[in-house]
Curated annotation (Swiss-Prot):
GO biological process: carbohydrate metabolic process; DNA repair; glycolate biosynthetic process
Name of the protein in its database record: Phosphoglycolate phosphatase
Annotated function: Specifically catalyzes the dephosphorylation of 2-phosphoglycolate. Is involved in the dissimilation of the intracellular 2-phosphoglycolate formed during the DNA repair of 3'-phosphoglycolate ends, a major class of DNA lesions induced by oxidative stress.
Organism: Aliivibrio fischeri (strain ATCC 700601 / ES114)
Keyword GTP-binding listed: no
PANTHER family: PHOSPHOGLYCOLATE PHOSPHATASE
UniProt-listed Enzyme Commission number(s): 3.1.3.18
UniProt KW Transmembrane keyword: no
Active-site annotation: D11
Binding site for Mg(2+): D11, D13, D176
Pfam families cross-referenced by the UniProt entry: HAD_2
C-alpha cells in the first residue's frame, strides 16, 4: 500500500507532542481571567484539534458544541488571553511521545521528505520544534493560519502535493484525530492513525484510516514492509 510514498505529512499536537498540559493550563487561566468556569485537563484534551479559536469557543461554551450566539469579540478576547498564557508558560509541560525523535530522524535519513501540517497557530510552532530539536527534519511547516483553510480541509495537503510534484498515493498523512484522517481522505492520500492522541473522545478507527497503531515507531515497520 505504501510502496510509492515519497512525502510524509505529520500532525503535531497529539501525534508528535503531548501538549495538552500546557494548552489546558493556558485556556484555564484565560477562562479565570474572564470570570468563566475553569477548564480541566480532561476537558481540554477533548476540545483541542480544530485550532485556537475553536478551543476558546468550546471553553466559553463549556461544551464541545459551540454556542450559536457566542459573541465574536468575546472569542477574540479569550483567544488573546490564551495566546499570552500559552506563550508565557514556555511549553514546559509538553513532551514528545515515545520514539518520535528517533523515528523522524530515521525516516529523514531514509530519504523521505517530511512536512508538518498542524492546526496550531503558526507563531508557536518554530519555538516548539527548536525546543525539541526537530526543526531540521521538516522541509515545510504549515500552521493553522498559514492558509485560509485548516484540517480537515485538504488544502494544505494538496498544496504540498503541488509543490513537490507528487500524486496523492505518494503522500502519507500521520495523525491522531479525525481532522487528519478526513484531510488525507479528501486529498486522496494514505493515512496512518495513532490511538494515543486527542480525538474528541472518539476511537480513531471510526474514521477508517489505512493503518491504526498504538506506537509511533510502527510507522518504520509499515514503510519497511512496503519497500
Amino acid at each position: 500500500m505504501f510502496e510509492d510514498i515519497k512525502l510524509i505529512a505529520f500532525d503535531l499536537d497529539g501525534t508528535l507532542l503531548d501538549s495538552v498540559p500546557d494548552l489546558a493550563r493556558a485556556v484555564d487561566l484565560a477562562m479565570q481571567d474572564m470570570g468563566y468556569p475553569r477548564v480541566t485537563l480532561e476537558q481540554a484534551s477533548h476540545w483541542i484539534g480544530n485550532g485556537a479559536d475553536v478551543l476558546v469557543s468550546r471553553a466559553l461554551s463549556q461544551n464541545y458544541i459551540v454556542k450559536d450566539d457566542l459573541d465574536a469579540e468575546l472569542i477574540k478576547q479569550a483567544r488573546a488571553r490564551l495566546d499570552q498564557h500559552y506563550h508565557d508558560g514556555g511549553h514546559q509541560l509538553s513532551h514528545l511521545y515515545p520514539d518520535v525523535k528517533d523515528t523522524l530522524e530515521r525516516l529523514h535519513q531514509q530519504g523521505y521528505t517530511l512536512a508538518l501540517v498542524t492546526n496550531k497557530p503558526s507563531q508557536f510552532v518554530p519555538e516548539l520544534l527548536e525546543q525539541h530539536q526537530l526543526t531540521h527534519l521538516f522541509s515545510e511547516v504549515i500552521g493553522g493560519d498559514t492558509f485560509a483553510e485548516k484540517k480537515p480541509n485538504p488544502f494544505a495537503l494538496n498544496w504540498l502535493l503541488d509543490k513537490h510534484g507528487l500524486t496523492a498515493p505518494q503522500m502519507l498523512m500521520v495523525g491522531d484525530s479525525k481532522n487528519d484522517i478526513q484531510a488525507a481522505q479528501a486529498a486522496g492520500c494514505h493515512s496512518f492513525a495513532l490511538t494515543y492522541g486527542y480525538n474528541h473522545g472518539e476511537p480513531i478507527s471510526d474514521s477508517q484510516p489505512d493503518v491504526v497503531s498504538d506506537e509511533f515507531k510502527y510507522l518504520l515497520a509499515v514503510l519497511s514492509m512496503a519497500r
